[in-house]
Amino acid sequence: GLAKAFETAFKKNGGEIVKTIKITSGDKDFKAVVSQIKETNPDFMFLPLYHPEASMIARQSKQLGLEKPMFSGDGVANQTFIDLGGDAVNGYMFTDFFDYTNPPSQKSADFVAYHEKETGKAEMNSFTALGADTYNILIDAMNRCEDPTNSVCINEQIKKTTDFDGVSGKITINKEGNATRSAVIKEVKDGKAVFKATVNP
């Protein structure tokens, strides 16, 4: 999963994992976990978790005086995480797939403008952009089939998608069906997630 992928990439780039702690989804008391982390004194904490557990670890870390940078994947990429974490998640960073304030292309900017025209607001989460990308990749694959209703052909063509100009950026899908795409890094500031950087594959 995400933890293993991070560990592999981090070590490859010279990083050292000083402590790995497994937690159970649904846990609420992380004081013992936080105490273990304090003892190791890491430079930062990577939490491949969803928002309920990540927000509680952040809050309990602050309560126990553990002030280290925290980073997660898109499992915390929602306003609920920020609301649950409160001041404890200020400065928390995480990855996401799209940021409407920094569209990566003209196509993306046009989509944001269309969304604002239709809904009355530009603000959107990444699932809106990903939904549009899914639809457009499917249509593109169907158009490359002699019979656009042939599911076998559609599946084959989806897995041949290369540098597709999506709302969220360029997308390539391999023969296993896994997508390679850019990611954005966001940081929590004053109760909102704000764009920080784009990371390209």
Task: Tell me what each language-model feature is.
Residues 1-201:
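Extracytosolic ligand-binding ectodomains
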